[in-house]
Regions:
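Bacterial N-terminal signal peptides that target proteins for export
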Residues: 2-12
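C-terminal motif of bacterial Sec signal peptides marking the signal peptidase cleavage site
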Residues: 21-22
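Mature N-terminal segment immediately following signal peptide/propeptide cleavage
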Residues: 40-74
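Peripheral, non-catalytic segments that deliver or gate enzyme domains
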Residues: 51-57, 75-80, 95-102, 107-401, ...
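Beta-propeller domains
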Residues: 70-91
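Glycine-rich His-Gly loop
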Residues: 351, 420-424, 584
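Cap/lid segment of the alpha/beta-hydrolase catalytic domain
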Residues: 378-494, 501-502, 507, 536-546
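Active-site-proximal cap/loop segments of hydrolase catalytic domains
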Residues: 452-646
Length: 646
C-alpha cells in the first residue's frame, strides 16, 4: 500500500533527491576488440553480460498469495509475466515492444496496473490488465500528462488513487480511479502549492505537503470532509517529512531534523502540532525510512544507510524473520520486497557488491525459502571485484565517504582509474552490485565513487555546505578524491578518466574544464553544460521548486556571474582532452541543448569529441540495444585513451 506520494523530487525528506540523476536501466555482453583493455583473456567477460536485460526481476505476490508476477524481456523489452505460486509455467500479460514497462503492481487479486512512458519523456500513462493477459486498457490516455500512484487502496478491490497534472501541467490533482468502469473522479484539486499527498491506513486523503519554492509545509485534516489546515511550516533546508500515519490514524510518523543535524524518526501530533516521541536515530547518518506490518498494525523497524544498508528492529517477530533469512542466505544483503495481505508469503531479494542477486519466495507456514530466479545467472560472483567503503578528507576538512573498486586480482597500485561521480546531486552512491562499476573493473580500471558535499544522508550541515557550490567546493571534493588516490599510490596520474551521468555529467564537464590537467579523457552522459539553459528548460511540474533551486544552485539574474563562472560551456578553451558525449533526444530534465552546445563548441575549437544521440531515449538509455551501443563506445574510448593492461 502506498501511503505517501510526492509529485516531484523536491521535498521527500531528501530534498530534490535524484533530480538530475540519469535514469538508466543498466540491466543487471561481443564487445569492441580494440585497445589494450578490451582483448579477450583470462577473466574477460563480454560487455553484454553486464548490461543485457535481467533474466527475471521485480517479483511481487498477489494480495491473496496465490500468484506471482515478475518482469522479463520479450522482444528486448521488459514485460509483465504471471504464474501460479508453485508453478513454473508463466503467462505473458503485456506486449510492450517499443518501451520497457516502468513499474507495475497488483491492483487486486486478478488485475495488474502498470506505468509506461513514450521514448523517455517521463509522461507516464497508467494501464490495467487481467492476470491472464486479457482486457489490457490505457486508463489515462492523455497527451503530455504524467500519472503517479497515490495509494493502491489494498483494501478496495475496485479503486485506487492517482495523481495527474492533467488540469494544470505544473501541479498534480488527486483522482479516484474506478476499475469497473474506468471512471476518474477528482477528489482533491491542487491549489498550486501542494507538492505531495498522503493517505491514512483507510485510504483517506489526510495529509498534503506544500512548497512556495523556498518554504515547505504540511497540511492536515481530520476527515476528508474537513478543510486542510497547516500543522507545520519550515524552511526547505529543514526536513520534516511525513512517512505514514500511526495505525489508529491519529498521529504521524515523521522524519525530522528540526533542532538537530541528522534526520531521525519521531511521532507527531497534528492536533497539538507538537513533535513527540523519538522513535529512532543514528549518530552518523539520516534515518528517513520505516518498515511496518499492515496486518499486525505495528512499525517493525527502521532502515538507514551508512557505508552499507542497516536495520534497527522494534519488533521481535520481524527481527527473527530477518535473522532466519540471513542465516539461509549468508554473506548477502537480504530484504523483503513484497508480501501478501495475510503476510504469510513474502518475496525476498538477496544481493551483494558482487552479484545482482536473486528472488525467493518465503512461506511462513513451513519456513521454506524457494528460489524463484537469479536476476543474472550468467554473472559469476567469484569473478567480480569487491566494492570497498573508503573515506578521505576534503581540502577544507570535511570527511568524504565513498567506494573504491579495484579490479579483481590486481594490486591497488598505479592503476588506470575511472572517477564516477553520482547524479542528483542531492542523492548518494550506495554499496552494492553496480554493472557499470563491475564492467569497468573487468576491463582493468579502478573505480572511485564519492559522496561529495550536498550528497544526501549525511545530515543537514553536509547537505547545505554544497549550496551554490556547483563547480566549486562540490567539485573540489571530487578533485580531492583524485588526489587522494594519487597520494595513496593507487592511481596512475597519467591514466585517470572521469565519467558521470546527469549531475555527474556536469561534474565530468567541470572536471575537464576547471582541472584540465587532472584527467586523460572524459565521458559526459546526459550532463548539464549550461546552468542558464537548465533553468530555461525545467519540466513544468518542477516549477514549484524553481526558487528552491535558485537558492541551491544560483539565481540566473541575481547570481549571473556565478552561473557563468561555473557553467562549462563558457570555458571551452580550458578543455584539452578527448570527450565522449551521450544524450537522449527526449530528455525532459537535461534537454538535448546541453549536449548540442558543448559538442558544437568543442568542434569549433577542434577539440576531439564523439557524440551519441538516441532518438527514442530520455534522461538515460533504457532500451537494451542503446545500452549496448553506449557501453561499447565507452569501452573503445577508454581503451584508446587510458590503455589499461589486463
Amino acid at each position: 500500500m502506498k501511503k505517501r506520494f510526492m509529485v516531484q523530487p523536491l521535498c521527500t525528506g531528501l530534498i530534490c533527491a535524484g533530480m538530475f540523476t540519469a535514469c538508466m536501466s543498466t540491466g543487471v555482453g561481443a564487445a569492441s576488440q580494440t585497445g589494450g583493455s578490451v582483448h579477450a583473456g583470462t577473466g574477460y567477460i563480454p560487455l553484454e553480460d553486464f548490461f543485457k536485460n535481467p533474466s527475471k526481476s521485480r517479483f511481487t505476490v498477489s494480495p491473496d498469495g496465490t500468484h506471482i508476477a515478475f518482469m522479463q524481456a520479450w522482444k528486448n523489452r521488459m514485460n509483465i509475466f504471471v504464474q501460479k505460486r508453485g508453478s513454473d509455467t508463466a503467462v505473458r500479460v503485456t506486449a510492450a515492444e517499443n518501451r520497457d514497462i516502468a513499474d507495475y503492481f497488483w491492483a487486486n487479486n486478478s488485475l495488474l496496473a502498470f506505468l509506461q512512458d513514450t521514448g523517455g519523456d517521463e509522461n507516464y500513462q497508467l494501464f490495467t490488465v487481467q492476470k491472464d493477459g486479457s482486457n489490457l486498457k490505457n486508463v489515462t490516455p492523455f497527451k503530455d500528462v504524467r500519472v503517479e500512484i497515490v495509494d493502491d487502496l489494498k483494501d478496495n478491490e475496485h479503486e485506487m488513487l492517482i495523481a495527474m497534472n492533467k488540469r494544470n501541467p505544473q501541479v498534480f490533482d488527486v483522482y479516484r480511479l474506478n476499475f469497473t468502469d474506468d471512471s476518474l473522479t477528482m477528489i482533491a484539486e491542487n491549489p498550486g502549492n501542494i507538492s505531495g499527498w498522503m493517505t491514512d491506513h483507510d485510504g483517506k486523503l489526510r495529509v498534503a505537503m506544500t512548497t512556495d519554492g523556498v518554504n515547505t509545509g504540511v497540511l492536515y485534516r481530520k476527515t476528508e470532509q474537513d478543510p486542510f489546515e497547516p500543522i507545520m511550516a519550515t524552511g526547505f533546508k529543514d526536513t520534516f517529512s511525513p512517512l505514514l500515519m500511526t495505525f489508529d490514524n491519529k498521529e504521524l510518523y515523521v522524519a525530522s531534523n528540526l533542532g538537530r543535524d541528522k534526520a531521525a524518526i519521531y511521532t507527531f501530533n497534528p492536533e497539538t502540532k507538537k513533535q513527540g516521541k523519538l522513535i529512532f536515530e543514528h549518530p552518523e547518518v539520516d534515518v528517513e525510512s520505516l518498515i511496518y506490518s499492515e496486518k499486525r498494525k505495528v512499525i517493525t523497524g527502521a532502515v538507514f544507510y551508512a557505508d552499507k544498508r542497516g536495520y534497527h528492529f522494534f519488533d521481535t517477530q520481524r527481527a527473527e524473520l530477518q535473522a532466519e533469512l540471513e542465516k539461509k542466505l549468508p554473506g548477502l544483503e537480504v530484504g523483503i520486497s513484497s508480501a501478501n495481505r495475510d503476510e504469510t508469503v513474502y518475496i525476498v531479494r538477496s544481493s551483494s557488491d558482487k552479484t545482482p542477486g536473486a528472488y525467493y519466495v518465503y512461506d511462513t507456514a513451513d519456513k521454506s525459502l524457494t528460489l524463484l530466479a537469479d536476476i543474472a545467472p550468467w554473472i559469476d560472483s567469484t569473478k567480480m571485484a569487491s566494492m570497498q567503503p573508503i573515506q578521505y578528507k576534503s581540502s577544507d576538512g570535511l570527511t568524504i565517504h565513498g567506494y573504491l573498486t579495484i579490479p579483481a586480482g590486481k594490486q591497488a597500485k598505479n592503476l588506470p582509474v575511472v572517477i564516477n561521480p553520482h547524479g542528483g546531486p542531492w542523492a548518494r552512491d550506495y554499496w552494492g552490485y553496480n554493472p557499470e562499476v563491475q564492467f569497468l573493473a573487468n576491463r582493468g580500471y579502478a573505480v572511485l565513487q564519492m559522496n561529495f558535499r550536498s550528497s544526501t544522508g549525511y545530515g543537514k550541515d553536509f547537505w547545505t555546505k554544497g549550496f551554490k557550490q556547483w563547480g566549486k567546493k562540490m567539485q573540489d571534493d571530487v578533485t580531492d578524491g583524485v588526489r587522494w588516490l594519487i597520494s595513496q599510490g593507487i592511481a596512475d596520474p597519467k591514466r585517470i578518466a572521469i565519467y558521470g551521468g546527469s549531475y555527474g555529467g556536469y561534474t565530468t564537464l567541470a572536471g575537464v574544464t576547471f582541472t584540465p590537467d587532472l584527467y586523460a579523457c572524459a565521458v559526459d552522459y546526459v550532463g548539464v553544460s549550461n546552468l542558464f539553459t537548465l533553468f530555461e528548460t525545467l519540466p513544468p511540474y518542477w516549477e514549484q521548486g524553481r526558487q528552491m533551486m535558485y537558492e541551491m544552485i544560483g539565481d540566473p539574474e541575481k547570481d549571473k556571474a556565478l552561473l557563468e563562472e561555473v557553467s562549462p560551456i563558457f570555458h571551452i578553451d580550458n578543455i584539452k582532452v578527448p570527450l565522449l558525449v551521450a544524450q537522449g533526444a527526449n530528455d525532459p530534465r537535461v534537454k538535448k541543448e546541453h549536449a548540442d552546445q558543448i559538442v558544437n563548441a568543442l568542434k569549433q575549437k577542434n577539440i576531439a569529441v564523439e557524440y551519441m544521440v538516441k532518438d527514442n531515449e530520455g534522461h538515460g538509455f533504457h532500451n537494451e540495444e542503446n545500452r549496448f551501443d553506449f557501453y561499447r563506445a565507452m569501452e573503445r574510448f577508454f581503451a584508446e585513451h587510458l590503455s589499461a593492461d589486463r
